[in-house]
Amino acid sequence: PVWKNIFNVCAVKEFSSCADDYPMSVHVLDVGKADCIFITCEGKNILIDAGETSIYKFVNEYLRKMNIKAIDQLILTHQHSDHVGAMSYIVDEFNIKSFMMPQLKDDMIPTFRSYERLLISLDNKGMKAERPEPGKSYDIGPMKIDIFAPLSQYDDMNNNSIVMKVTYKNKSFLFTGDAGKESERDIISAG
């Protein structure tokens, strides 16, 4: 789509022109119709989603080329395969300091293989998923993550997406996962 090309051109120009003198960088990885966003700032790293399973090698190589060994905050915005796919490999290959994903109703818990592998990988490392709390903030080095959603456990998986703002100094980025209209209305109503 045209908007994607415009965003890609603007993002490349903006981030490449300030990368040398601005310590925060946001990398929106091209993983097709999936999501994978890497944020780094002053030695602290955040990875939001991990695309489909098939792109694991690409994500792994990308992070290795940047000399990344640890991820301070790994975030699964919601439990659809185009967000969780390669995440178990990330957990296995990197030092993950904290992991966050939304709580789901029992009848919505996925049974697809990549999600089950993620749970096994977390268990093998003795990690538990932290549940996002709207209104709560997390400090990741000089960056701050403010959680806006999910405000409820919804019947639509996309509406269970973690919606967050990542801020460094006077710059902030809003990440919405695949939150839909119901979640958006609730965020606006909550103020």
Question: Where are the regions that the model predicts?
Answer:
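Non-globular, low-confidence helical/coil segments that flank catalytic cores
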Residues: 1-191
